[in-house]
């Protein structure tokens, strides 16, 4: 989960960059924080997709096979 502190610091650096610019140290920190944010975002998104089940109008499950396989590997499916 993405922490409020992480987002607050990213936003703080973004505002400072627009207002007066960043030092090299702050620029490096901003890049590191962005990478951490993206890593956490992708992990959360992947988890949501892996828990997803898709059904058509007739009630038949049409979840993509790749997602089904990941769910089987993690013990989330019985089929």
Swiss-Prot record:
Compartment annotation: Cytoplasm
Pfam families in the record: DUF896
The entry's keywords: Cytoplasm
Superkingdom per UniProt: Bacteria
Gene3D superfamilies linked to this entry: Helix hairpin bin (1.10.287.540)
The UniProt record lists the keyword DNA-binding: no
Protein's UniProt keywords contain Cytoplasm: yes
InterPro entries, per the entry: DUF896 (IPR009242)
Any single GO CC term annotated in Swiss-Prot or TrEMBL for this entry: cytoplasm
Recorded family membership: Belongs to the UPF0291 family.
HAMAP family for this protein: UPF0291
Name used for this protein in its record: UPF0291 protein lp_2062
